A protein has these predicted regions:
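Hydrophobic ligand-binding cavity/cleft-lining segments
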Residues: 2-86, 90, 183-198
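Short, surface-exposed coil-to-beta transition loops
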Residues: 32-34, 98-99, 122-128
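A short, structured loop/turn motif at beta-sheet edges
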Residues: 40-44, 104-109, 130-140, 182-189
Length: 198
């Protein structure tokens, strides 16, 4: 049996240095993590999957559902009623949660910036999903997570937080990027096959 090809989610050095939407919301981050994937479809076909993210009544995070979606499978289709966004909307982090990621900024088919803030409004982190045109009609999905000065993982000092969060984030983010790419590209195959039917 042939081994499954490893698909990279590594951001290029240029992408790591490139300013992205949402960077201005945390001007002096204490940490930043970048990942990216090339999706073989146009931006307009990737965007709906980003717009409907979130746990609980939303489409899921397309990652490890037993960890971040209460074992409920993430959606395998675009859900029209979840496509409308507004700044200030909450994407529940977990099923049943009353808090979660707040929509801080978005531009359809270009970027979605989510964030986590404290009750007093201090911004702890931002999580930007950015769509850029790639070669041959593809899309480059770049994801950047930035931590503000107050960010800590279960009260641990920053040097420990950085190592733990980087490892967890890589695992979950890789799964999400692969999950989004699979859904978008599979939709293209379904459309192609359907178009061949008599």
């Amino acid at each position: 049996m042939a081994m499954k090809r490893w698909r990279s989610v590594r951001a290029t050095p240029e992408e790591r240095l490139h300013a992205l939407p949402g960077d201005e919301l945390i001007k002096e981050p204490i940490g930043s993590l970048d990942h990216a994937i090339t999706i073989r479809r146009a931006r307009r076909e990737v965007w709906p999957w980003l717009a409907q993210m979130g746990a609980g009544s939303r489409a899921g995070w397309y990652s490890y559902d037993f960890l971040d979606n209460g074992r409920r499978p993430s959606a395998e289709r675009i859900i029209p009623e979840l496509q409308k966004l507004a700044v200030g909307m909450i994407f529940p982090a977990l099923p049943g949660a009353t808090d979660g990621f707040t929509v801080l900024a978005f531009e359809p088919q270009h970027f979605l910036v989510l964030g986590w803030t404290t009750p007093d409004g201090a911004r702890l982190m931002t999580w930007a999903h950015v769509l850029e045109d790639g070669e041959h009609g593809s899309t480059r999905l770049i994801v950047r997570a930035r931590a503000g000065p107050g960010y800590r993982f279960h009260g641990l000092p920053w040097w420990a937080t950085k190592r733990i969060v980087a490892a967890i984030h890589f695992v979950m983010q890789r799964k999400q990027l692969l999950g989004i790419a699979r859904r978008v590209e599979r939709g293209a195959i379904i459309e192609m096959v359907a178009g061949e039917q008599p």
